[in-house]
Design a protein with these regions (language model features):
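Long, contiguous binding/interaction regions
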Residues: 1-45, 49-165
């Protein structure tokens, strides 16, 4: 089962390396990784998606909490968080198929971000599931290039992962 782990860390060099090293040493695979500075420039938030049972995730949390630069760790409960990825995808398409691509983009709420005589580049921000569905819909047209971010996630409701001010 996939688990989403949110980690607040001190924002300085080497922190991400120590966290990825911990996963590597323990034999845990990272399926998705996203890092960004929070509203406090001294703190970054790392969102990790990893496969494992509850025991494995509990061990990951314990190991992360032992790292000096880690401020807080929380495994986000399934169905209690919002998750998004960003996809940019370039399709090599002639004029005859362009309207089909635009219809798919409209149905999936994707934006056209670049258009040339031979290519259409689309952007979609959505759940991992919908991103994968969109990609599958476009495969028959010939994907020239594809770029995906790691997943980011935030807990639903009033609960928040933050450092008390």
């Amino acid at each position: 089962m996939k688990h989403t782990i949110s980690v607040l860390v001190e924002n300085h060099a080497g922190v991400l390396s120590r966290i990825s090293g911990l996963f590597s040493r323990r034999g845990f695979n990272i399926d998705s990784l996203a890092v960004g500075v929070t509203d406090n420039p001294e703190i970054s938030r790392i969102t990790i998606v990893a496969e494992g049972n509850d025991y494995t995730v509990e061990q990951i949390e314990k190991q992360l909490n032992k790292l000096i630069d880690v401020i807080k760790v929380r495994t986000l409960p399934a169905h209690e968080f919002l998750q998004r990825e960003l996809l940019m995808i370039k399709i090599n398409v002639g004029a005859d198929k362009r309207s089909e691509i635009m219809t798919i983009a409209e149905i999936m709420n994707a934006k056209i971000i670049d258009l040339t005589h031979t290519t259409v580049t689309l952007e979609l921000s959505d759940t991992t599931y919908h991103i994968a569905r969109f990609e599958e819909m476009l495969k028959p047209y010939g994907i020239t290039e594809i770029v995906r971010t790691g997943a980011i996630a935030i807990q639903k409701g009033s609960d928040a992962l933050q450092v008390k001010k």
